[in-house]
Amino acid sequence: MDQTYSPGHMSYELVKADEDFLSTTPSDYSILRRRPETSPYYRTPGPAISRFLRRRYSVEPTSSDYLGNGTIPTTVMYKICSYLNKKDLLHLMSTCKRFRDIGKDSSFWQFLNLYGKHISCSSLHAIIDRKVQVLRLNSATINVEVFPPWHNFPILNPAMLTHLDMSSSKFENPSVLLEILQRCHNLYALSLELCGIIDDQMCKEIAKNTNLYFLNLAMAKSFSAEGIVTILSSCRKLGELNIGWTELSGDVINLTCQLLPPSLKRLSFSGTRDKAEMNDDNIKRICDTCKQLEELDLSDDVVITENCLDHVKNLKNLRILTISRCYGIEPMAFLSLQNLDIFNVYGCVTVEGIDVLRSRLRPTRINVSPLSSIAIPTDGESVTSIWKKRTRDWY
């Protein structure tokens, strides 16, 4: 039989519930209102089934600092850091002051590869301050930050750089390149290929590197007579010089041929095209001054004739000669070059003519290298090394 609820009966139940609530002790009430602790739980990976497991509490905290001074010797920490690449080393330096001081040691920053990176000017100077010796900035973009008027700029000390590759680098402001060159007075190798305008002030800073051996200025622009004279008058230990396609004026070409250092072993003076100053007389002047030349590139110098080959043959150490697209030279004169290892004449003769040269000039190799490697930082299989100096970490 169904039970019938009357209004009086409902009021009786509410009164009964109130009496039970009032009879509850304060301790029971606080227990009921307490929320469960969710932090010890975590969701485990798996299928659609939701499983929650209780996390095991860690051991009692200890006051021992296992990485503090005196526990692990500093020499051991230096050894550990020597196996880290630059990215992991920076992460380690951000953990504590001790690791930051250890990570700043110059032994970890002897070389650095920033190929194609976007980097601020202040960050680049901070890297140079860590006494980097070999720095690759090929195709990098260097930006300039905007600082408030009250910002205190740090004093830029002389850099320890010996090998610097800034080929195809992009500078937001030409003054950035000048600031970098102002810090570098001990360079052994420098590449400014495709770096845009090289003014007289930059040439003066380059000239301060009196021990410079490799200098690549290919496709740079705006060289003045004063700038080129400053460089060639101071850098008398140059072994490899590349000034191809630099759009030199006639006066600058004459001065360059007169001031080339006798120490040169590899020279690229290509791309003068129809400049009348790049003639047989200046080729004679080059051969008389630089008698130790082992490789000479005169490609796209269309004014020179076969008469210049008489002077080239006097270079006893010459092993590689490139005269590609020198249309003013009579092809029959090529047969007089008997003592070369490599002879590049791209665009001067036909395919049949190449076969004739290979048979008549044997064992000279014909048309082996279409691109010049004179003073070029990366050459051959070492795509991350510059002038045979490594720039890449082990991993």
Q: Each predicted region: which residue ranges?
A:
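Concave beta-strand-loop units of leucine-rich repeat
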Residues: L114-G116, L137-T141, M166-K170, L192-G196, ...
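Flexible interhelical turns and helix-capping residues at alpha-helix boundaries
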Residues: N85-D88, Y188-S191, G347
